UniProtKB/Swiss-Prot annotation:
Keyword Secreted in annotation: yes
SMART domains: 14_3_3 (SM00101)
Coiled-coil zones: none
PANTHER family: 14-3-3 PROTEIN
Organismal lineage: Eukaryota, Metazoa, Chordata, Craniata, Vertebrata
Protein's gene: Sfn
Organism of derivation: Mus musculus
TM regions (residue ranges): none
Other comments on record: 14-3-3 proteins have been shown to be PKC activators, but this effect could be non-specific and only due to the acidic nature of the protein.
Protein purpose: Adapter protein implicated in the regulation of a large spectrum of both general and specialized signaling pathways. Binds to a large number of partners, usually by recognition of a phosphoserine or phosphothreonine motif. Binding generally results in the modulation of the activity of the binding partner. Promotes cytosolic retention of GBP1 GTPase by binding to phosphorylated GBP1, thereby inhibiting the innate immune response. Also acts as a TP53/p53-regulated inhibitor of G2/M progression.
Positions of post-translational Phosphoserine modification: S5, S74, S248
Name of the featured protein: 14-3-3 protein sigma
UniProt entry tagged with the keyword Cytoplasm: yes
Keywords: Cytoplasm, Nucleus, Phosphoprotein, Secreted, Ubl conjugation
Compartment list: Cytoplasm; Nucleus; Secreted
Length: 248
């Protein structure tokens, strides 16, 4: 299928909310070897984030049920829940491995500018983070190191090449801070990164174009929400789940 046709079908699949189809079309487009435009890389991101988002949510529900049935000593439900959770986990790993393969084989090395490179390295950090959520033991440690390395490389480039209000730079800092808090168990680092990012963007807000204003201020609000949540947590109050960058 022609590249232009694949992109068109991915857009149709998005409108129909058939995200697995959308992801398959975008995967084929990436494998054609041409660099993606800004719109195309967003299509790729939205497709896979929706696919993996459903799997992550399902895995959390099943893990919670499994934990509860183990605590209750329920031999009736236990094996079935474990088996189904493992099935979802295998699917989730498969999607993450596919995305990481596309990033390493095509997208990162083909990125022609700093913004694209940061976008793809952030994506690499995100998909290693999703793998870390379901990993255990030595495997988890290796995956966490890979996520941290990708996020850090993206941060280094973004600080040199992009303004503090750039939505991609802000989204990267948001997700890296969530990684610090939820995966690496480093709440102080998470709070420090979120606060510094928010403060630097706030100081630079007057330079924002109308096009970027909505995207940037939305992510700044999420950074502030997380800071409120994490500060309450560290004060011993009941928190909740930290928001990360929105799907689209």
């Amino acid at each position: 299928m022609e590249r232009a046709s694949l992109i068109q079908k991915a857009k149709l699949a998005e409108q129909a909310e058939r995200y697995e189809d959308m992801a398959a079309f975008m995967k084929s487009a990436v494998e054609k070897g041409e660099e993606l435009s800004c719109e195309e890389r967003n299509l790729l991101s939205v497709a896979y984030k929706n696919v993996v988002g459903g799997q992550r949510a399902a895995w959390r529900v099943l893990s919670s049920i499994e934990q509860k049935s183990n605590e209750e000593g329920s031999e009736e439900k236990g094996p079935e829940v474990k088996e189904y959770r493992e099935k979802v986990e295998t699917e989730l790993r498969g999607v993450c491995d596919t995305v990481l393969g596309l990033l390493d084989s095509h997208l990162i090395k083909g990125a022609g500018d700093a913004e694209s490179r940061v976008f793809y390295l952030k994506m690499k950090g995100d998909y290693y983070r999703y793998l870390a959520e379901v990993a255990t033991g030595d495997d988890k440690k290796r995956i966490i190191d890979s996520a941290r390395s990708a996020y850090q490389e993206a941060m280094d480039i973004s600080k040199k090449e992009m303004p503090p209000t750039n939505p991609i730079r802000l989204g990267l800092a948001l997700n890296f801070s969530v990684f610090h808090y939820e995966i690496a168990n480093s709440p102080e680092e998470a709070i420090s990164l979120a606060k510094t990012t928010f403060d630097e963007a706030m100081a630079d807000l007057h330079t924002l174009s109308e096009d970027s204003y909505k995207d940037s201020t939305l992510i700044m609000q999420l950074l502030r929400d997380n800071l409120t949540l994490w500060t309450a947590d560290s004060a011993g109050e009941e928190g909740g789940e930290a928001p990360e960058e929105p799907q689209s």
